Amino acid sequence: MQAIYDIPEILFQHGVTDVVLSPGSRCAPLSIAFSRHKKLQIKVVPDERSAAFIALGMSLQTQKPTVLICTSGSALYNYAPAIVEAYYQRVPLIVLSADRPPEWIDQNDGQTIRQQEIYGKHSKAFFQLSAEHELPDTQWETYRKVNEAVSISEAYPKGPVHINIPFREPFYPKGEIMFSGSPTVIKREQPLHTLSDEQWKSIQHKLDSYKKILFVGGQHLYDESLRLKIGNIKAPFIGEVVSNLHGVRNVIHTHDTLLTSIPLTDLEELKPDLVISFGGALLSKWLKQFIRSNESIDHWYVGPDVTTPDVFQHLCQIIPVQLNEFLSKTTIASNTQEQFVQRWIQQQTHIIPAIREFNTKEKVFNEFTAVFDVLNHLPAFAKLHLANSMSVRYANTLGISQRNAEVFANRGTSGIDGVISTAYGYALKTSQLVTIITGDLAFFYDRNAFWNNYKPSNLRVVLLNNHGGGIFRMIDGPSALPELDELFETKQTLSARYLATEHGLEYTLCKNLNGLNQALESFFQPSMFGKILEIETDSVKNTEVFKRFKKTIQQSYLS
């Protein structure tokens, strides 16, 4: 077992310090070895699905791999939603799964399934270790594969890796276990993506042929140096809420409302001849349709990605460098381009006060206005997590006023599962305030996020409880069907009050605007416990208000 007992030290030497394990018998050698390593921080989370998302949140904060440890059988499958999200969101995770000896697979033995390559192509790499841990060659193999797994997880694009480890009985150590102190550690320097001077000259020559260039940012971590550089570029940048470009001078964050509201003649003036995209997944359906429907638009992607999705169906150039380098090496300047920037900014200048005026005058208590108020109360340097469905879309429509806020969302796969656990894990790794805005289905789906012994007092949960999946009332298809309530909206009558009591969280319920404003005065203040702010609304009224908002913005162009 010496090779197994040395795995924690190898990972520590690579800078890995965080471990989330779920209790089990077959994984005992791993659990004991990691828990007895004095320099690792161990969190024990019983629910494997929640554990994996908590690990995802921790890695989002640290930008280092978090280790996941589980027993054999279905436990490993429960990691799958978070592994897929980590793969597409490019978050490093290292899964260590215990397994039965290979000869016992498919022999009707308990907790025994086919675990090899269980995550398929959603894991960056899979490594199968031997069950014969005492052999010298096996020790060498273990050291080599663990080192390789860490390097692959951290190589761009970052992502999850899986190491499957079979154990024979007996696997519980008797007495102390011995750490060798000097296991083999293999470091790998990450390559730099660079282009030659001739390539940059060619890129600049092509760039000069375009007169109206529009940058589009997908999901991207907050990067102050990039934000400063973007602010000095003479081009409009469309920044979604998850692009973390809010507050930058030439960034357009009202594109969703803008593209569905302005007259067609004005829309034509906003059409670029080149779109340069960067970052991950895009949220806006209308932005995608706007670019896809204009066949004359060319599309470049900037980023050192292995694969580049042709999201606009116009991709013609891939530049495999980070955007910072691209902006440093190229120049975008022309009178036409300056006019193009101003057209976009003028349209946004019209939209922003209209959004503010609508929400300050709205008398019906609803989710959209509630999110507007919550976002306006966010403290400086807020860490904001957004659940999928309407929460992230409301925020994308409204924009973030706090320039230094960092925004996160599980947009890798855009599922509702694990959003509370992700924010929970992030909160465990920072002393700063972490806020999650979530709908009721995502909240109750992931209620086991709170089922552990770690209670971050810096966690703030804003629960938009309309007692169902409100997004389905916003969509033309399901909203017109008689099965809307039962098959799509999934009406429920739950409240977070008892969950808050059970897990020691401060709880406030708001059913009107005055109650919300009063609650927000103290909600973000420091406290000994985490807090839940439950905002109860009616889904029918929410839909009516949001549709009225869109109509109001459209009419503002006619007045």
Swiss-Prot record:
Pfam families: TPP_enzyme_M_2 (PF16582), TPP_enzyme_N (PF02776). Pathway: Quinol/quinone metabolism; 1,4-dihydroxy-2-naphthoate biosynthesis; 1,4-dihydroxy-2-naphthoate from chorismate: step 2/7; Quinol/quinone metabolism; menaquinone biosynthesis. Keywords: Magnesium, Manganese, Menaquinone biosynthesis, Metal-binding, Thiamine pyrophosphate, Transferase. InterPro entries: MenaQ_synth_MenD, MenD_middle, THDP-binding, Thiamin_PyroP_enz_TPP-bd_dom. One of its GO terms (biological process) is menaquinone biosynthetic process. Its EC number is 2.2.1.9. It catalyses: isochorismate + 2-oxoglutarate + H(+) = 5-enolpyruvoyl-6-hydroxy-2-succinyl-cyclohex-3-ene-1-carboxylate + CO2. GO terms for molecular function: 2-succinyl-5-enolpyruvyl-6-hydroxy-3-cyclohexene-1-carboxylic-acid synthase activity; magnesium ion binding; manganese ion binding; thiamine pyrophosphate binding. Its cofactor is Mg(2+); Mn(2+); thiamine diphosphate. Signal peptide: none annotated. Gene3D superfamilies: 3.40.50.970, TPP-binding domain. Binds 1 thiamine pyrophosphate per subunit. It is an enzyme of class 2 (transferase). Catalyzes the thiamine diphosphate-dependent decarboxylation of 2-oxoglutarate and the subsequent addition of the resulting succinic semialdehyde-thiamine pyrophosphate anion to isochorismate to yield 2-succinyl-5-enolpyruvyl-6-hydroxy-3-cyclohexene-1-carboxylate (SEPHCHC). Belongs to the TPP enzyme family. MenD subfamily. Homodimer. This is 2-succinyl-5-enolpyruvyl-6-hydroxy-3-cyclohexene-1-carboxylate synthase.
